[in-house]
Curated annotation (Swiss-Prot):
Residues 380-390 have a biased composition (Low complexity). This is Mitochondrial distribution and morphology protein 34. GO terms for cellular component: ERMES complex. Its main location: mitochondrion. The gene is mdm34. The lineage of its organism: Eukaryota, Fungi, Dikarya, Ascomycota, Pezizomycotina. It comes from Talaromyces stipitatus (strain ATCC 10500 / CBS 375.48 / QM 6759 / NRRL 1006). Component of the ERMES/MDM complex, which serves as a molecular tether to connect the endoplasmic reticulum (ER) and mitochondria. Components of this complex are involved in the control of mitochondrial shape and protein biogenesis, and function in nonvesicular lipid trafficking between the ER and mitochondria. Mdm34 is required for the interaction of the ER-resident membrane protein mmm1 and the outer mitochondrial membrane-resident beta-barrel protein mdm10.
């Protein structure tokens, strides 16, 4: 057996829907709500639709004129819908940042209070199927009890449909609430509605309670009762007290433009303080933004750099290396003077347009660290003298501590500084070979040769000092050859006076125990010196290869410094 319901009287009665909305609102707020919902749930719209449910009688227990009791199987697949409004708490530090790009986000750091967002939910496309126990009585109304969970599915449409995880969460939460509603609250709501329809006493008692509630609430407060101190209109013009008094809630004047000028300035400053590129950045209450703290952090770092200070690029760092290292003292002084102009910006070389290194390999620069030629060097090369008279008196020797070699400071961060401008000349390999040969001759022979007699005494002294300082790199390792103590005492080279700052070592103790060894060594040294002298001077008294010896007597011109 089946029943056909006439749904038209329910749709025609406007009071029925109003009362049903109030009952549903009270039922939804009565049950424990999830913590995300921070406001009351209000039913704003209710419509049962035009399709009634289907009931199938399974059992009839009691049947009379004023009462009925039976068990039914109910199924519903209609067009009823329900609209709810509430406020939910959102987390601005998580949901807002996920849905916004980084350049348009105010970047909140912390929130002291929760953010409440209005939420509108529409429930539609109900699918119900279950067993219902129905009891009807004119004195007690209608009682409906579900033996199982009737809710199969429904559609939830909300404000957050564009956010997938919020939509899924609301779907699950509302389905859980509706299951509890059908099992507990819906039978009570149906019972109260039936009492209002069939029991007049209950209807009168309920109307009296509603009237007393309206009287206790009283009239609403007028927000214009206390106007601001300096009101302005929408154009920013100040308003007189008479114009403010003429305004009312029902007038056509724009009430929303009536704000204090101080409040407008504060709101403008608050909007500008977020410092984002988005034109519609929402304001979140009790939230600290990163842009607010960044201004104080940048304040300290701005004091270190000046906006007017120039920034050198990578191309400008090669200016110091454009000068060629010519053996000229004026050129080198100009080089050091030109490079000192960049001493103030040495730390800013990496802060130009190219902060990252390029893939191109850096070129290695070969810097000529040799001292430029002077007239003193030319004299030393020709063999007349190794040191000039000025250098011998004023220049520091190799035995003293290094002094300030130049007053000019080379602060070029790219080109390394030149070698100290010593007045002490480093002899070439040929000079040191000639000096070592002369030393062997003086050491092995008691009578000086013709070439040694021709040289001045100052040249011999200088040659001896250089021979002691720079040993011959081409000398063949031999046994120790030392002069006897008597010859060493008479030798003027060994008694040369050294400066006071020189590090003097005690002379080695000669080994005089074997006279035969000394005689053999003296004979070998004299023979070697004689052969070398005969090779230089031919049998006829002239050199056999004058061009060869002249070329080796002159100092070789050092090659120019390599470019970069």
């Amino acid at each position: 057996m089946a029943f056909n319901f006439n749904w038209s009287p329910l749709m025609a009665d406007a009071g029925f829907y109003t009362r049903a909305q109030d009952l549903l609102t009270a039922a939804l707020n009565k049950s424990p709500k999830p913590p995300i919902i921070v406001d009351d749930i209000k039913v704003t719209e209710l419509n049962l639709g035009s399709i009634p449910p289907d009931l199938e009688i399974l059992e009839v227990g009691d049947l009379a004129e004023d009462r009925f009791r039976g068990i039914f199987k109910m199924s519903y697949n209609g067009d009823a819908f329900l609209t709810l409004k509430t406020r939910v708490q959102a987390n601005p530090l998580n949901t807002f940042l996920v849905t916004r790009p980084s350049f348009a986000s105010p970047k909140p750091l912390a929130a002291a209070a929760g953010l409440t967002i209005p939420l509108q939910i529409t429930l539609s496309e109900f699918r119900l199927s279950g067993f219902v126990v129905l009891v009807f009585s004119k004195q007690k109304g209608i009682t409906v009890v579900f033996r199982n969970d009737p809710l199969e599915s429904l559609k939830v449409s909300s404000t957050f449909d564009s956010i997938s995880f919020v939509r899924d969460y609301l779907q699950k939460a509302i389905e859980g609430q509706l299951r509890a509603l059908f099992m507990d609250e819906l039978p009570a709501i149906i019972h109260r509605l039936s009492l209002r329809l069939w029991v007049p006493e209950y209807r009168d008692r309920e109307s009296e309670s509603v009237n007393t509630l309206d009287q206790s609430s009283g009239p609403g407060q007028d927000p214009l009762a206390s106007p601001p101190q300096d009101p302005v209109d929408a154009s920013g013009n100040a308003l007189n007290p008479s114009e403010v008094a003429s305004l009312s809630l029902d007038s056509g004047v724009e009430i929303h433009s009536l704000f204090s000028q101080k409040n407008l300035l504060r709101l403008a400053a608050l909007t500008d303080s977020q410092r984002t590129l988005s034109l519609f950045t929402p304001s979140i209450k009790d939230v600290v933004y990163r842009a607010w703290t960044a201004s104080t952090e940048l304040g300290d770092s701005n004091t270190l750099t000046s906006p007017a200070s120039p920034v050198l690029s990578r191309a400008q760092s090669h200016i110091g290396s454009l000068h060629s290292f010519v053996d000229n003292a004026s050129t080198i002084s100009m080089q050091s003077g030109g490079s000192s102009n960049f001493s103030g910006h040495g730390l800013n070389l990496r802060s130009g347009r190219h902060p990252r290194p390029h893939g191109k390999k850096r070129k290695k620069r070969v810097v000529d660290l040799r001292r430029p030629k002077t007239t003193d060097d030319m004299e030393s090369v020709s063999g007349e003298s190794v040191f000039s008279s000025e250098n011998a008196t004023s220049a520091p020797t190799i035995f003293s501590s290094p002094a300030q070699f130049s007053e000019e400071k080379n602060d070029d961060p790219v080109t390394p500084p030149l070698a100290p401008q010593n007045d002490l000349h480093l002899p070439t390999i040929h000079e040191r070979r000639r000096i070592s040969q002369g030393e062997h001759t003086l050491t092995r022979r008691s009578v000086p040769s013709m070439s040694e007699v021709a040289q001045p005494s100052s040249s011999r002294n200088s040659a001896a000092m250089i021979a002691d300082t720079w040993p011959d790199p081409d000398a063949t390792p031999r046994n120790s050859i030392r002069l006897p103590s008597s010859d060493r005492a008479n030798n003027p080279l060994t008694t040369a006076h050294l400066p006071s700052s020189a590090i003097q070592y005690p002379p080695p103790i000669p080994d005089n125990n074997d006279p035969r060894q000394q005689a053999w060594l003296s004979k070998m040294a004299a023979e070697l010196a004689r052969r070398i002298q005969e090779e230089k001077v031919g049998p006829s008294g002239s050199r056999p290869f004058p061009d060869f010896w002249d070329d080796h007597s002159r100092e070789e011109i050092p090659p120019p410094a390599y470019g970069h």
